[in-house]
Every structure is written in C-alpha cells, then in structure tokens.
A protein has these predicted regions:
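Short acidic/polar alpha-helix capping motifs at helix-coil junctions
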Residues: 1-2, 33-38, 82-86, 109, ...
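Short, flexible, glycine/charge-rich loop motifs used to bind or transfer phosphoryl groups or to couple energy/partner
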Residues: 13-14, 95-99
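Short, surface-exposed, polar/charged, turn-prone segments marking secondary-structure boundaries
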Residues: 53-54, 73-77, 103, 110-114, ...
Length: 176
C-alpha cells in the first residue's frame, strides 16, 4: 500500500525527482548554530533574514491567513542549501516540530518553477499544505509551501519557488 502511495506521488509530483535542493534544521539558537556549523563544517557565508511581516506579503496556515515570525540563516554545503530556522512566534510547522521532536532536521526543500501549478498537483495528489508564505523577493515574488508528509515520508517537504532576486540580508556571517 505505502509503495503504491509513493508511486502515485512520483507521477503527480514530478518535481520531487529533481533532487533535494535544501536541508533545513530547526534550532533553539540561530546565532550559536551558525557559528558552530561554520567552525565545524566550514559552511558559510550565512545570510540572515527575519521572515514574517513586513518581508512576507502572504502568510497562511492550512489555507487561512496567519501571522508568524522566524529567523533564518541560509548558506550552501556543496550544491545543497542549508537553512537554519529559529521559530520566534505564531502557529507554525516549526513549533509543531519542536513540540513533537525537539530540535533537528525539520524538512527537505524541493524547487518548483511555478508554485500555482505545483500546488494544484499537490491537491490532486491528496496532500495537505500546512503552511505557506510568499512575496519575499524585491519584486513581490518568491513562495514556499510546506506539505504534510511526515507520517508518509518521515519528514516534511517544502516546495520552494525562489524569487528572481533576493532582498539584501540583514547580516552576513562571517563578514566577507
């Protein structure tokens, strides 16, 4: 039965076969984790952002308007983006994860070219979008959506439509 569900997802969500673009960790202390990852693994530079208002123009939880905030730091390890997230406030997938598991790897991110089309496919596949947000690019583009896949796949999947341009980070570590 479970293999049938996975095959169904492969056919309905072909963008998942492109490979994992991002691994994300939910942590208690963003700054401390970034410094540790830089010292231990040589990962950096890290770009810091606070997601929520005013950066995000759209925020939803289970399809309804929501408000939440989190600090994130982004970097790369090879071709894979590493995202470190510190939950700040609101009802989020991060708070759910912390409550259920504590801190650790919370989701895998997959790139999509067209979020509207991807979300239509998600609906057709029978998956639930638990949290989404967007408008964080300088041109009002960029969107993310979390799918309830933990029970099925052992982790949450995030769909990511990157903005064409990024806002300048609040800070960079280490300073270049």
């Amino acid at each position: 039965m479970e293999h049938e569900v996975i095959r169904n997802l492969q056919s309905k969500l072909p963008f998942l076969s492109r490979g994992v673009a991002q691994v994300a960790y939910v942590v208690e202390d963003l700054e401390e984790t970034v410094m540790s990852y830089h010292s231990l693994f040589g990962i950096g530079p890290w770009h810091f952002y606070t997601y929520g208002k005013p950066l995000l123009k759209t925020m939803k939880r289970y399809g309804k308007p929501a408000e939440y905030r989190m600090k994130v730091a982004l970097s790369y390890f090879g071709d894979t983006r590493i995202e470190i997230i510190q939950h700040l406030e609101g009802d989020t997938v991060y708070a759910d994860f912390i409550h259920k598991h504590g801190y650790g790897i919370q989701h895998l991110g997959f790139l999509v070219d067209n979020m509207d089309e991807a979300l239509q496919r998600v609906e057709e596949a029978g998956l639930i979008v638990s949290m989404e947000g967007g408008g964080h690019g300088p041109d009002g583009d960029g969107y993310f959506a979390y799918l309830e896949t933990e029970d099925l796949l052992g982790t949450t999947i995030e769909l990511i439509e990157r903005p064409k341009r990024r806002q300048p980070p609040e800070k960079i570590f280490p300073i270049q």
